[in-house]
Amino acid sequence: ALKDEFEEHAEKAKTLPENTSNENKLILYG
């Protein structure tokens, strides 16, 4: 289940602006 959830978040992360830092992604999806 965790893998599926991670992949779903990864797909969403691709739609974020390129200038969104990995740190911000961790806050959003961590």
Swiss-Prot record:
Stretches for region Disordered: 1-30
Domain ACB: 2-30
Sorted UniProt keywords: Cytoplasm, Lipid-binding, Transport
Keyword Metal-binding among UniProt keywords: no
GO MF term (any one): fatty-acyl-CoA binding
Keyword Cytoplasm part of the UniProt annotation: yes
Entry GO terms, CC: cytoplasm
Compositional bias of kind Basic and acidic residues: 1-15
The organism's place on the tree of life at top rank: Eukaryota
Compartments, record wording: Cytoplasm
InterPro entries: Acyl-CoA-binding_protein (IPR000582)
Described function: Binds medium- and long-chain acyl-CoA esters with very high affinity and may function as an intracellular carrier of acyl-CoA esters.
Family: Belongs to the ACBP family.
Stated name of the protein: Acyl-CoA-binding protein 1
